[in-house]
């Protein structure tokens, strides 16, 4: 399932700014509205705990992937402002609910000693799938000359095929600890909540501001954006597992201090950059720091009551999106 997400989301994200500008005639105002709408399902991620009354977490994850894939598949068919808003919301519901459940299941199933390394491997698998996606996008636009619609359909369709495979090949994983089916907010988790809030702010700068900066200010094409994403994914594939191992050695505190110190430097540089090459370098460095967020998850795994994990994963995503 880790490999299924980038097939849709990387397709959607890579094409978004160019599709919005070239087909739906978006300006910065519409992009801002779209990104706000995209974050609403993330803001409501706490509600995933109520689905546990009806579905198992594994089932929720698969249904979420179906929504993610469907939203991506049909995006190119609706090249209007309202159409792009609607398909984005569908895609976003699937993406955010899947990510919430993926975090929950990972922290429940993985041993604490091996969690950083395995989470790094999960990132690496997703990065590999992203590389394949970026290569397909580059071939589709630069060599074959396809339009946005079939490329969106290929990305979403590939995710649906993986979901079908998962349903057949992995019908059931046992539940180790029964999870709470109500919202959990505990005072002793305050530092985790604070880190989650900061993580949401940095994510918005990367996804919303930096990506649009590349297209609007520096005129990056679909192919050029794909190359940037390709570089980011290659670095993750090569180093995410090693970063996970390193976090297991140096500890979560040292990793998080290094991450946020580096991000301060990158964000200040964003404010003054006027060179397309320098901006691209900052974009790559910015993305590289995402792998260090493993430390935040494993920190919570160490301090949490095991029965709190599912509910807390939803609450954390909501806090992340408040910022």
Q: Predicted segments — roles?
A:
Residues 89, 93-124:
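Cytoplasmic helix-loop-helix junction between adjacent transmembrane helices
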Residues 76-87, 271-282:
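Helix-loop junctions at membrane interfaces in 12-TM secondary transporters
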Residues 119-135, 319-323:
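Glycine-rich segments within core transmembrane alpha-helices of 12-TM secondary carriers
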Residues 44-57, 141, 239-252:
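Helix-to-loop junctions at the C-terminal end of transmembrane segments
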Residues 14-29, 208-225:
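Short amphipathic helix-loop junctions that connect adjacent transmembrane helices
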Residues 137-141, 156-175:
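C-terminal membrane-cytosol helix-exit motif in multi-pass small-molecule transporters
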Residues 16, 97-110, 291-304:
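Intracellular juxtamembrane helix-capping segments at the cytosolic ends
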